[in-house]
Amino acid sequence: MATTYLQLSNELLRELNEVELTSANFGDSVGIQTHVKDIVNRSYLDMVNEEPQWPFLATGESGATDPMYGNTYIETVAGTRWYELKTAASSIKDDYGYVDWDNFLLTTVGVSGESAPYTVRNLRYTSIETWKDYFRGGQNKDDADQATGGTPSRVIKSPDNRKFGLSPIPDQVYRIWFYAYDLPTELSAHGDAIVFPDLYVPVLINRARYYLHQFKDNAQNAAFAMEDYKRGLRTMKLHLMDPTPNYFKDDRIRFS
């Protein structure tokens, strides 16, 4: 079971020799108890904001609903170019925290009425500047005529970062798969659990100790805690972000 907001707060309160909180009085904390809760949240957000592509922030599991590439998808509409990345989001604060623009895939697998042979294609990311200079004029002239569309080969990002566009304009329904990562949220209730494995709880605690020592004007201990935090964070990144060897790739064949 993942470590909770209450457990993290009490671990720090014990170190300070202060009265611990309970699930019953967690919302009625005062003084140093409230300060510790604030520090836990600040440290937690420091950690999860360190890397927008932490595996535990993924919006879904790859292949959970379909063996295709990606962890979420949008279905296109014939004759429509632009689509919200997160359809249920009402503003940017509810959008995805990160989208991997190098991993968009188009397919007809799973589309109602489609059968083999299916269309499957990688979508090349094209900057909005390149698209508007070389493609927008001609394609927008035909925007109202879906017959002039086709199977998209490029994906573009809207200037406000909230939508993706397809070029050429889709001529039918396709599924567009991609990898998305959620924005982290603050801990609030006593039972709220951290999103990362308990193995890395000491990293969060060291970050919280840094803030506590700063609060008490203990610069030396704050520096020690910061070094412990940085060391733990490097290990965390090594285990969760860099488990595979580095390599160079050539996209000339991939998108041909």
Where are these regions (language model features)?
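Glycine-enriched, solvent-exposed interface loops adjoining structured elements
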Residues: 1-256
